[in-house]
Every structure is written in C-alpha cells, then in structure tokens.
C-alpha cells in the first residue's frame, strides 16, 4: 500500500513539469490548432517564447519590412553556429522558418494586422484594383492598390499581439508602437500600455 501511494504521488509531481516542457517545445501544428480553436488566449506566456513564433516574426521582418535581424556572429568561413541562423555573408542572419511560415496564413495575417496598427501601413499585395476587385487571397482594395487586411478579427488575440510587441521592443522593428495617449500624470489607461514619458507605449510583455 505504501509503495502504491509513493507511486501515485511521484506521478502527480511529475505531471506539471512534463506539461511545462511540452509547452516550451510546442510544434507549429499544435500552435496552429490552438489558434484555430481560440485556446491560445488562455495559455501562459510560455508559448510566447516558442521558436515557432519568433522565427515566424523574423521571416515576416525579412519579407515585408526590409531586412533580417543579425544573429551576432560572422560567417567568413561559411558556417553559422547560432540555431536558426544561416550565412548572409559576411554576417549570420535569422531565416530558418521561411517555408513553414509561408503556409500559415493565420500567422501572416495576424502579423499584417499588427503592421497596419503599429507600423503605419499595410504591405501591398502586388496588384492594382482599378476595377475594384482584388484576386489575391487575404487582400482587399485600398485604391489604387490591393493591401492585406483580411484578419482584423485576429487583433483580440492578446497572446499574439503581446508577442509581436515583445518582438518589436527587442529592437528588430525599430521601437514600440505608441498607444495614442500621453502619460504626463504617470498613468496609461490603454490596456497593455505603460508610461514611457511623455507617451504611453505598448509593452505588456516586458515582464
């Protein structure tokens, strides 16, 4: 009987650790399922440190915002040692998730929504809409060109939005978006914003 109790207690204490590890290494497919089901909103910030998200953000940065963050090493010998980096001579840059991210329209459109809101404009879809119609999926007419804006509904996903903000804060996108209010009195009323005097900026994931 004592042996049975010890085994049950051991299993109970082992479960949380195993679950935490599983969250840390969440796969792209599992993350996509969470987003589809709306379950990602209720998860802990552990998921935000997922390399899937970070590399998707980097891929987006390369494709839409004109450059890749540097990995902190050179590749004069043709090799990069940092995981997720490859040689863009003479430096190593992050670009490991290009193909996988491209097949995830949910992430791409969420990133686009963030770009529209925080970086002052939408990426262009590569076609004009003089006739009022856009043929590219996820694009609509902002005359005279088509722009990506199909996933406005993705904005309420705080987990994604805050991960994007954390990425922006790292310096890869040139700073934090301003929240649209001042904080002369030291307080910010917009959710997810705090005072970077004299304005409020989005930094909900600083913790």
UniProtKB/Swiss-Prot annotation:
InterPro entries: Cyclotide (IPR005535), Cyclotide_moebius_CS (IPR012324), Cyclotide_sf (IPR036146). GO terms for biological process: defense response; killing of cells of another organism. Keywords: Cytolysis, Disulfide bond, Hemolysis, Knottin, Plant defense, Repeat, Signal. Residues 21-66, 96-120, 150-174, 204-207 form a propeptide. Varv peptide A and kalata-B1 are cyclic peptides. SUPFAM superfamilies: Cyclotides. Disulfide bonds join 71-85, 75-87, 80-92, 125-139, 129-141, 134-146, 179-193, 183-195, 188-200. Residues 1-20 form the signal peptide. There is a cross-link at residues 67-95, 121-149, 175-203 (Cyclopeptide (Gly-Asn)). The presence of a 'disulfide through disulfide knot' structurally defines this protein as a knottin. Probably participates in a plant defense mechanism. Has hemolytic activity. Belongs to the cyclotide family. Moebius subfamily. This is Varv peptide A/Kalata-B1. The gene is Vok1.
